[in-house]
């Protein structure tokens, strides 16, 4: 039986900042709008949430606040990965303590450990907690990717239940599906590959698009699950321009800009991220207007 934390579209939610910290009132508003819009899970303190720029206190409080605000209505997945195993364990144990449903564990970045190192790292974290963990494979950012044989080993751990796959390599994803079996959940980490990964037996997407169009991301998945593949594929194609615009500069610059355009007090990007180039901002606005999100 597949060990899914959620099925469908989980939002890789932004973190609204002030000049001095996290804007929790606005985060709460965004969470409520996401739930009302059909999001299937909240994924907090990930790449899109600018977790790399958050202090330890901010990281912990964002997780605690989100769990409290969601109140069990949908799953909360907490990003607790680190390139220091001991710190990842501390964050993961904290997330479990405050009630997160699952962990999202990015591969250790910068140090570029071996595949044996990945197995040891993830096993030690999973052994330290009692809640499930989703691996996060994004080699374009971290400098290390999870190989097929490593997936096969890690999938045997009872608390390592799936992966957010953002490598973009569908052939590698096909191989990981074959190596891990049907009970290992695969979530697309790329909004332009929702339907392709669902076609390989995927469980859904951890989505940037969901920030601005939660119903669309949910519906793409739901149509596929309902065996209406034609409609799911049509929606994937129809939203390609908005997805392209949300990634025309490095994530989360465009999506945070988009959230401001939609009336959210998303606050500043934290340095070294910078504001969008005007030509890309115009592309983003055009896509938002086309889909009726911006007047």
Predicted features by range, described:
Residues 28-31, 148, 281-288:
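Short, amphipathic alpha-helical "lid/cap" segments that border enzyme active or binding sites
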Residues 127, 141-247:
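Catalytic alpha/beta core domains of metabolic enzymes, predominantly
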Residues 27, 59, 63, 88, ...:
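A general structural signal for well-ordered alpha-helical segments in protein cores
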Residues 37, 61, 65-70, 94, ...:
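Alpha-helical structural signal in soluble globular domains
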Residues 2-11, 15-143:
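Active-site beta->alpha loop and helix N-cap motifs at the rims of alpha/beta catalytic domains
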Residues 8-16, 37-39, 199-202, 206-295:
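C-terminal alpha-helical cap/extension of soluble enzyme domains
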Residues 2-5, 175, 184, 259:
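Catalytic cores of TIM-barrel enzymes
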Residues 137, 159-160, 270-271:
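Glycine-rich phosphate-binding "P-loop"
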């Amino acid at each position: 039986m597949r060990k899914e934390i959620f099925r469908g579209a989980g939002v890789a939610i932004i973190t609204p900042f002030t000049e001095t910290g996290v804007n929790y009132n606005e985060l709460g508003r965004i969470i409520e709008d996401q739930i009302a819009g059909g999001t299937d899970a909240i994924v907090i303190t990930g790449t899109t949430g600018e977790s790399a720029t958050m202090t330890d206190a901010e990281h912990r409080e964002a997780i605690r606040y989100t769990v409290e605000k969601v109140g069990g209505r949908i799953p909360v997945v907490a990003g607790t990965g680190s390139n220091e195993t001991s710190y990842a364990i501390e964050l993961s144990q904290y997330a479990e303590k405050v009630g997160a449903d699952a962990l999202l564990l990015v591969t250790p970045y910068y140090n570029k450990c071996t595949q044996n190192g990945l197995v040891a790292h993830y096993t030690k974290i999973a052994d330290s907690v009692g809640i499930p963990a989703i691996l996060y494979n994004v080699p374009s950012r971290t400098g290390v990717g999870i190989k097929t044989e490593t997936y096969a080993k890690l999938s045997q751990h009872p608390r390592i239940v799936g992966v957010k796959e953002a490598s973009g390599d569908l052939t590698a994803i096909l191989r990981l599906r074959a190596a891990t079996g049907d009970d290992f959940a695969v979530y697309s980490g790329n909004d332009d590959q929702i339907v392709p990964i669902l076609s390989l037996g995927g469980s859904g997407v951890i989505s940037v698009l969901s920030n601005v169009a939660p119903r669309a991301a949910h519906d793409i998945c739901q149509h596929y699950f309902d065996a209406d593949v034609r409609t799911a594929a049509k929606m994937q194609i129809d939203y390609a321009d908005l997805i392209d615009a949300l990634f025309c500069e490095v994530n989360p610059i465009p999506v945070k800009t988009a959230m401001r355009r939609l009336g959210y007090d998303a606050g500043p990007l934290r340095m070294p991220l910078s504001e969008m180039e005007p030509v890309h901002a115009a592309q983003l606005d055009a896509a938002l207007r086309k889909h009726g999100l911006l007047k």
